[in-house]
């Protein structure tokens, strides 16, 4: 029994897809356990970029099983489109498995997402308008439609009619918006269900059987710890649990079967959407990092907010997700800066604090306390070992490890597979 969980430790976009793809080479099963097509994974293979939103990064290994777990909310239309995209690129998807217990995103979820966001005005959360939140709302309210329901024509029709009656009353009376007709959805989405039917199964059985047989299973998180609905910057969060604990709920695998948790972070910080961001940069340094790092959302295309590395955020993520190993990405983006900074603590009303406050009002008053380190001017994109890094870059990497309190297992100096350097094999230490 060998399993590794990959989680983002910041606000998403840390490069989880790349690290998952990298670790997938030694895994036999790769599974997603939460989120939906609001997540964006960019994988570079032979200098070619592939962008995925629903399907696990392991799909590029035809000999490995890729799983969409029960904790994922699935937009059938997006999934069918993504499958077609992969097929056009010559990628087989015969190794994909989809949980019959996963909940389905339907057009009324997307419409409600948009109407709710518009109604918030200046207090908007910054949702991707993908229907993720409303789908999880229906799940919690026990009125959601699952993949198993989508495949049964009669059950799908019955539940869709019931849900539309309720949602349309909401659209018309609360939002003064046009209703959605049953005929606009039913045949189209039932058709999508039939297209994905061959992939649908009880994925909990597949995952547990694999673990019991001693196979290596990799769990792939979406978004990041700071977007977790319980442990993140609530309410500026996603509607699921990206933390490692979400694996057990979202995949049907017990906590005793989790061996390692790899936390993925960038050498700086970024986030998309609204919400607190203590180390955010508004100057030319921030603009430089954004452009060199290509900091634009995979899903939304929106410019990401960027800032210095925040070890307070990282220690919070380490604690609530039980991180055992760190994967540090995008060190190359900081090349050319005379000075680099790391936030080591916050100043809250004149008092130094080392933890991340739950209160948004307190966070607004938090000022980062920085430790400054000398930068480096060398091009490090071809570096293949820690020793080959310039001394200042090497010191920066080591200082991050010290402040976070987790050993760094890999560091990357670019988007390519060959630009990921191993300091310690995650699989070998299990």
Curated annotation (Swiss-Prot):
InterPro entries: Adenylosuccin_syn_GTP-bd (IPR018220), Adenylosuccin_syn_Lys_AS (IPR033128), Adenylosuccinate_synth_dom1 (IPR042109), Adenylosuccinate_synth_dom2 (IPR042110), Adenylosuccinate_synth_dom3 (IPR042111), Adenylosuccinate_synthetase (IPR001114), P-loop_NTPase (IPR027417)
A Pfam short name: Adenylsucc_synt
Chemical reaction(s) catalysed: IMP + L-aspartate + GTP = N(6)-(1,2-dicarboxyethyl)-AMP + GDP + phosphate + 2 H(+)
Coiled coil: none
Binding site for Mg(2+): 13, 40
EC number of this enzyme: 6.3.4.4
Signal peptide segment: none
Gene Ontology CC terms, in alphabetical order: cytoplasm
EC class (word): ligase
HAMAP family per UniProt: Adenylosucc_synth
Subunit note: Homodimer.
PANTHER family: ADENYLOSUCCINATE SYNTHETASE
Similarity comment: family membership: Belongs to the adenylosuccinate synthetase family.
Function field: Plays an important role in the de novo pathway of purine nucleotide biosynthesis. Catalyzes the first committed step in the biosynthesis of AMP from IMP.
Official protein name in the record: Adenylosuccinate synthetase
Source organism of this protein record: Streptococcus equi subsp. zooepidemicus (strain H70)
Gene for this chain: purA
